Amino acid sequence: MKLEQLLEGVPFTLAQGSLDTEISDIIYDSRKAAPGLLFVCIVGTQRDSHEFAADCAAKGVSALVIQHDIDLSAMPGVTVVKVESSRYAMALMSANLFGNPSRQMTMIGVTGTKGKTTTTHMIKSVLEAAGRKVGMIGTNGIYYMGRHKETANTTPESYELQKTFREFLDAGCDTALMEVSSQGLMMDRVAGVHYDVGVFTNLSPDHIGPGEHKTFEEYRSWKGQLFQRCDVGVVNIDDENTEALLEGHTCKLVTYGRSEQADYRASGYELLRTHDFLGVKFHVTGKDEMDVKVNMPGEFSVYNALAALAVGKVLGLPDQAIHDGLGKCVVKGRVELVPISKKFTILLDYAHNEVSTESLLTTLRAYNPHRLVVVFGCGGNRSKLRRYGMGEICAKMADFSILTEDNNRFEKVEDIIADIRVGMNKGNPEAKFVEIPDRLDALHYAVDHAQEGDLIAVIGKGHETYRDRQGVKTPFLERELLEEYAQQKGLE
């Protein structure tokens, strides 16, 4: 593709060279530099890849995209284009390179602090029940037409995102559904993508700190950007941040919640529990009337299901498809039951901070278990505040806690547990807990010491398939490990 075609829609200045330059692909990793490629110089939080421009030129790249001036004297044969934002330029160029695939599918984006993953899975289930062919991108990976790939970020870099959209389209997908993170919006990963439907779940303080957002207000503002890039916004009317988040929105709004003002509102919800089932059923009124049953527990599942229902209605899907899709949806690693015993209930969940842990435990407590037991750790090389917070919440809300490892990365598990212990002692000096550094041993302990009617939540890893010790990732699939142990023990 000619560079001029690649730059369509991108404001730029030609610093040197020719727009007739032929480009075979786009890269932003200097280690991949080779003839025929265009290297995008990105200013990152850790490194500025303009430092590698000369090296890439020496390796024969055909063109460079720069954001600030560099010494061009050592690269006379390379075409150089200057832009205001190299991330924004890369997003639009990537879309052009892959033929703007997002324009040829129904596009749905979901944002919020909690519930993005579950809501996207529910929407996918509803769409597929209606016969749609869906590609989905999010925290749990990329799914389309029976295939699955892992992702490094909730919202992939723009090049990978556009490449994935192309794969969706070529595989026969008619709809692309994705989690849209605040980082993805702020870093222009979704620049140039227009959504048919944008969804807002809820908002609470998160992702605030070095390399992320400076303030909660900034975080909220970036989340709100989605509603300036979609035709219809499906939003939680009950969230206290909704009005501020929607400031400057350009889309039509459809609301959901428990408020009387909601377009789709839930009433009369009932908790359902057996040893191998935790769920909820409720009635929907407003613009439509329907009974809904969901295979996931708690009030937050009601909100997630309402969001999916509203999206289905916006897209004109049949009520039966919405009902059936919600009824059969199960999300890997999100309040995922592992039915290994009739004596107790054990589940896996990705809750890995104070907010999500409190929300989960509040939900589970409502089912009145004999004991609420939590198995958890915290990630290494991350904020100590998260450890204190999770420890404090579990001490207050759980009957018994098993402190163990999560992804230790380059820290000692004993040091991480010591920080969690500080939070435990603050939350409840009388809290009952045990420390078992090896997570597999902790899982075995939880099963061995389970009592009749216990509800055991294994939190922090959820859908993850590995554990990280000293930067080395080894396979660790909690569901399989629990099932294997139950089989060894002969549990019923």
What do the predicted segments below correspond to?
Residues 136, 178, 198, 235, ...:
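Structural beta-sheet core signal
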Residues 23, 35-36, 61, 77-78, ...:
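Short, well-ordered alpha-helix to beta-strand connector turns
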